């Protein structure tokens, strides 16, 4: 096997293995990658159509929702086929501040093809109270699976997050899940995620918290799956299989750590102010 072919085979095994471990760990929503306009390359988690994921999903678990992300203006959804249930269950649409209307339009076309839809309101910290109420009103009309607060620049402190969460919770219909997607520019990703969960602990609002193994993500990275699930097990009576999560880290994450760098650093800690 050539070195290039061997590397592709390795990357395919990593993607497949991580998805398999996460579903065995009882993770409810597994984001498998992105949908992009370009054709899928073997061993990449940038897909063109949902069938590209069939290589990586080793027997769907009915308790899991398998998701891919799209940027509101970087994917031609006309190529998206009707949902046949074999790979993706849902698509997360991320849109920037002041582009909610456009994001919901593409979301509507995706929903019409039989996919569940989640929305990510990037840079939610930029929204005023009236902006948040208007966003909630639009989301209520659409009726997606959920809407996530996104701390795009890792600039939020707990009071910022809870202020936004309170407004959205007060105005979102109760059958719509509210989520939080953190970035770790100030090393606040885990702390804010815990605060978000604790705030809703006595609520009947269903919530979501985004995380990744070892906090892997662009730049400063995200909240870590291993810490979030441990916290939820110990403090909120959840039943995530930490052995599967830690085994995924031992088996697969070394490969990423050798090739890529992410996580807190001083430049990222000051970048959110500029």
Labelled PLM ranges:
Residues 30-32, 65-70, 89-93, 117-121, ...:
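Hydrophobic faces of well-ordered beta-strands that scaffold small-molecule active sites
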Residues 152-259:
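Catalytic alpha/beta core domains of metabolic enzymes, predominantly
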Residues 1-5, 9, 274:
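Single conserved hydrophobic/aromatic residue that forms the stacking wall/gate
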Residues 97-111, 126-131, 155-167:
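Active-site-adjacent beta->alpha loops and helix N-cap segments on the catalytic face
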Residues 43-67, 112-116, 164-178, 231:
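Alpha-helix-loop-beta-strand connector modules within alpha/beta enzyme cores
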Residues 55-62, 79-86, 107-112, 137-142:
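Acidic (Asp/Glu)-rich catalytic clusters
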Residues 112-133, 142, 148-150:
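Conserved anion-binding
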Residues 29-53, 152-155:
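Glycine-rich, proline-tolerant flexible connector loops at the mouths of alpha/beta enzymes
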């Amino acid at each position: 096997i050539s070195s290039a072919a061997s590397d592709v085979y390795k990357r395919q095994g990593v993607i497949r293995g991580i998805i398999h471990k996460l579903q065995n760990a009882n993770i409810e929503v597994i984001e498998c990658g992105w949908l992009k306009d370009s054709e899928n390359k073997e061993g990449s988690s940038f897909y063109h159509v949902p069938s590209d994921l069939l290589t990586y999903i080793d027997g769907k678990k009915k308790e899991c929702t398998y998701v891919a992300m799209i940027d509101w203006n970087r994917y031609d959804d006309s190529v998206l086929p009707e949902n046949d249930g074999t790979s993706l269950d849902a698509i997360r649409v991320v849109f920037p501040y002041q582009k909610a209307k456009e994001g919901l339009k593409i979301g509507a076309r995706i929903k019409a093809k039989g996919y569940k839809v989640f929305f990510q309101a990037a840079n939610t910290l930029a929204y005023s109270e009236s902006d948040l109420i208007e966003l909630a009103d639009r989301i209520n009309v659409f009726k997606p699976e959920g809407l996530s607060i996104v701390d795009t620049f890792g600039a939020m402190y707990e009071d910022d997050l809870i202020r936004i969460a309170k407004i959205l919770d007060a105005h979102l219909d109760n059958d719509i899940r509210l989520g939080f997607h953190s970035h770790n520019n100030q090393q606040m990703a885990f702390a804010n995620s815990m605060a978000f969960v604790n705030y809703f602990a006595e609520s009947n609002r269903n919530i979501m918290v985004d995380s990744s193994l070892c906090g892997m993500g662009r730049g400063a990275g995200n909240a870590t799956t291993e810490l979030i699930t441990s916290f939820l097990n110990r403090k909120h009576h959840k039943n995530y299989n930490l052995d599967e999560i830690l085994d995924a880290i031992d088996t697969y994450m070394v490969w990423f750590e050798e090739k890529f760098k992410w996580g807190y650093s001083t430049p990222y800690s000051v970048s959110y102010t500029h």
